[in-house]
Amino acid sequence: MADGDSGSERGGSSGGPGGFSQHMSREQETQELATKRLDIQNKRFYLDVKQNAKGRFIKIAEVGAGGSKSRLTLSMGVAAEFRDYLGDFIEHYAQLGPSSPEQIAQASGEDGAGGPGGPRRALKSEFLVRENRKYYLDLKENQRGRFLRIRQTINRGPGFSGGAGGGAGLQSGQTIALPAQGLIEFRDALAKLIDDYGGEDDEGVGLGGAGGGGGGGMYGELPEGTSITVDSKRFFFDVGSNKYGVFLRVSEVKPSYRNSITVPLKAWGKFGGAFCRYSEEMKEIQERQRDKMYERRGPGDRERSLGPGGGGDDSETEDVDDD
């Protein structure tokens, strides 16, 4: 176990006897399974795997030099997507060359304060939307260097018991800033926790958001997500569950945008059949097009395509007859 500055709910103000009892209730209901501490530059990061009645989730806490904390909460499914996104950011960061002083000054803004809010230009951006939570990932640069800013916003709509002031449509947010030099170490630590504790994945598990921990409870296991890369696009296939049942989320990701669709389990067979049918039809179309192109070629073109002497087998036969 790490020290008392872990990413758990310790250290927060109780806000009176009622708040203290609620805090103790949360501590009793939520179990901490594992924690990992990372020291990157002058910051400490804690990755805590927790479990409550709805399942497992990961809390990420950033502790600054002055002791200030920022926390993010990820379901195991979202954590797996973060792991994949971190790989993309690591690859993009590795391809970036050194910045000129003019570029750094432009990226840092006029004040040059060097804080997370200073940069105006993102080198690479991605975002995720899951139930009532949104996650924004921006690779930025200021006078202190390059870093990945991760911001989480929560829509505390009707029925969300997230504390005082949780009116309809109210959003609260937390932000952490991860130095780019620590991206690989952070990704590897997150991946290890997912590998060790991510077997009970659920789309909204443990987060207390709308639709979390519903109809997917009957499934003790769901297929693992995967991704494929085609040209400049990347497609993610993630299986999740909510109160409506099991679904497949297919996400199309390009450097400039991300789009996704959700397919319920009962439609998977129809989707798969449609893909297979179109794949076979396109193969037949391509074969017919190749045949037509071959027929359009004249005899001279076909002979040239066979190489010098026309057919190699006939040439060898003639040599044998001469002997």
Swiss-Prot record:
The record's principal subcellular location, in a coarse class, is nucleus
Q: Which GO terms describe its biological process?
A: positive regulation of transcription by RNA polymerase II; regulation of transcription by RNA polymerase II
Its biological purpose = Transcriptional regulator which can act as an activator or a repressor.
Task: Indicate the transmembrane segments per the record.
Answer: none
Bias kind Acidic residues: ranges:
313-323
**What protein am I looking at?**
Transcriptional regulator protein Pur-beta-A
Q: Write down which residues bear the modification named N-acetylalanine.
A: 2
Question: In which domain of life is the source organism classified?
Answer: Eukaryota
Family assignment from sequence similarity: Belongs to the PUR DNA-binding protein family.
Which cellular component terms (GO) are annotated to the entry?
nucleus
Query: For the region DNA-binding, what residue ranges are annotated?
Result: 27-257
Upper classification of the source organism reads:
Eukaryota, Metazoa, Chordata, Craniata, Vertebrata
- What InterPro entries would the database entry show? PUR-bd_fam
* Molecular function via GO: DNA-binding transcription factor activity, RNA polymerase II-specific; DNA-binding transcription repressor activity, RNA polymerase II-specific; purine-rich negative regulatory element binding; RNA polymerase II transcription regulatory region sequence-specific DNA binding
The subcellular localization recorded is: Nucleus
Q: Which organism is it from?
A: Xenopus laevis
Q: Where is the composition biased (Basic and acidic residues)?
A: 24-34, 286-305
Q: Which spans does this entry mark as compositional bias, Gly residues?
A: 9-19
Q: Does the keyword Disulfide bond apply?
A: no
Keyword terms, alphabetized: Acetylation, Activator, DNA-binding, Nucleus, Repressor, Transcription, Transcription regulation
Q: Where is this region: Disordered?
A: 1-34, 100-122, 286-323
